[in-house]
Amino acid sequence: MVCNLAIDAYYGCMADFSHILMTRPDFGDDDREWLHQLVADWQVIADLSFADLLLILQNGEGKYIIAEQCRPSTVMSLRAEDVVGNVVPESLCAELDAAMDSESVFRSSKLRTVGKAKVCNVYAPVRHNGKMLGLVVRETNMATRESNGRYESESISAGKQLYEMIPRGQFPYRNPVMNQRHNARVADGFIVLTV
């Protein structure tokens, strides 16, 4: 992972989500609020999917920056280090450009290596009020897909359904389901309701 020294210097060694959002003056308050709601609620997707999530935005200079990350509580994370504020390597930019142009979930054509793990990247474009804001990357360690039982298979399927709602603007929910956001924990169990 390549670290952007200019961003580190600008933010004083450690970038945070709010500061990264400030590099985008074209984002309105509504856009920022949508992204804040997304990262407040996305833990359930990481947990159900057994995958790390990254929110990638383009900064004011057009470089792809990791704006936020989410580690799953249901499986070991791929990343021990904090990658918020890091510039995405040039080798991934063409794939990110293609994902930004996609109307739905976009799957990487090749596996990547993160640490010692083989990883499949899947990208969900984040749009709000017709404006492209960025991408949520689901980084799946392929070792977690080798021998799944029914619980794991159902969990992955439910996580995939929620993840696919992001490009459609259906996740996060506009109104919180409970009085507080991010209450539920997948490890306690889950129920899938179909209508």
List PLM regions with ranges.
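Juxtadomain coupling helices with adjacent low-complexity linkers
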Residues: M14-F27, L135, E139-V186
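Non-catalytic N-terminal regions of enzymes
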Residues: M22-D31, L54-I56
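Short, compositionally biased low-complexity segments
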Residues: Y10-L21, I66-P72, L133
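Sensory modules in modular signal-transduction proteins
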Residues: D31-L54, P167-V195
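Short, basic/aromatic recognition patches
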Residues: V39-A40, L92-V119, Y163-V186
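Short, positively charged and aromatic/hydrophobic N-terminal segments
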Residues: C3-Y10
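Sensory/regulatory domains in signal-transduction proteins
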Residues: E90-E154
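Structured interaction and signal-relay segments at domain junctions
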Residues: W42-F106, V195
